[in-house]
């Protein structure tokens, strides 16, 4: 009993350590580049001074620049609230993501707290996140990549638990996971496509095995709707007309393939470890 309590203490100490470390890193990072643009109502040059301005800027951004409505809203909101509050929120998001990855790995909320696994995940995130400062600390970058990953990880957690036979059916759950699916699918493009295809595959698998429950396709449709909202934003086409002038469709596809191949190099050690441990 005493040993279990000590394990819990170490586990929570690791959580607090990661939060404090990330808070200090965020505290040291000043506003930079795009942060100044997003501190203002989009394309107006006027500073955001109210919640109404936050909504107005997000709306203008959606129609003039891109479809990332959730992450842009969060960025505008916390830049208006102030750097201190942003630093706290960003540190919480990073800590939450490590916790969510931990629960995905354990596939159970009730299993023993494993300090070593949690600490290893924190270290792996530090070493393997591509361009760590840009995606986990810089405000305009972290809201796009880190903040979109958290709702996606929450959204996919019930699917992981259900496939592990550790998640019960809940009558109230379909509308909840439908909304989570919208935020997961509408966060950032590559993650939105991933969560949509993954939940589609899980829905099909459960249907074939005759274990399909109502919340499973509900999440898929939510993710699909979020992805459509993200990709069909008028701002995407406005930006493409400006930035994509003189470039063909296949040129953009080639850039994406090259970019994702680069990302694989960052996580290659993790992939090799997984293969060696026969987890994939």
Task: Please report, for each region that a protein language model flagged, where it lies by residue.
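Transmembrane catalytic cores of multi-pass membrane glycosyltransferases
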Residues: 26-72, 76-81, 88, 139, ...
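Membrane-embedded alpha-helical segments of multi-pass membrane proteins
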Residues: 88-97, 142-155, 196, 264-269
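Start-transfer (signal-anchor) and selected internal transmembrane alpha helices
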Residues: 1-21
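Membrane-interface alpha helices of multi-pass inner-membrane proteins
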Residues: 172-189, 195
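Transmembrane-helix motifs of polytopic, lipid-linked glycan transferases
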Residues: 91-116, 154
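Membrane-interfacial loop-to-transmembrane alpha-helix junctions, especially the N-terminal start
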Residues: 108-120, 169-174, 211-220, 280
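Membrane-interface transmembrane helices that cradle and orient dolichyl/undecaprenyl
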Residues: 152-172, 209-210
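Membrane-interface micro-motifs in multi-pass membrane enzymes
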Residues: 117-160
């Amino acid at each position: 009993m005493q040993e279990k309590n000590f394990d819990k203490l170490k586990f929570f100490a690791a959580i607090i350590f990661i939060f404090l470390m990330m808070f200090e890193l965020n505290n040291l990072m000043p506003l930079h580049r795009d942060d100044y643009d997003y501190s203002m109502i989009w394309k107006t040059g006027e500073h955001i001074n109210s919640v109404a301005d936050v909504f107005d800027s997000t709306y203008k951004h959606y129609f003039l620049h891109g479809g990332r409505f959730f992450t842009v809203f969060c960025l505008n909101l916390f830049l208006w609230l102030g750097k201190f509050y942003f630093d706290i929120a960003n540190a919480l998001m990073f800590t939450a993501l490590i916790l969510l990855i931990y629960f995905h790995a354990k596939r159970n909320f009730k299993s023993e707290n494993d300090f070593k696994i949690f600490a290893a995940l924190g270290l792996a995130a530090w070493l393997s996140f591509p361009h760590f400062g840009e995606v986990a600390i810089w405000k305009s970058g972290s809201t796009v990549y880190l903040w979109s990953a958290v709702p996606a990880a929450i959204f996919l957690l019930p699917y992981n638990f259900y496939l592990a036979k550790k998640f019960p059916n809940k009558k109230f759950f379909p509308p909840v996971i439908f909304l989570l699916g919208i935020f997961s699918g509408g966060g950032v493009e590559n993650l939105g496509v991933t969560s949509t295809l993954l939940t589609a595959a899980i829905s099909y698998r459960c249907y074939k095995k005759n274990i399909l429950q109502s919340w499973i396709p509900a999440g898929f449709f939510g993710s699909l709707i979020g992805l459509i909202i993200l990709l069909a934003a008028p701002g995407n086409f406005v930006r493409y007309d400006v930035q994509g002038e003189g470039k063909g469709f296949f040129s953009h596809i080639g850039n994406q393939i090259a970019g994702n191949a680069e990302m694989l190099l960052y996580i290659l050690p993790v992939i090799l470890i997984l293969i060696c441990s026969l987890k994939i």
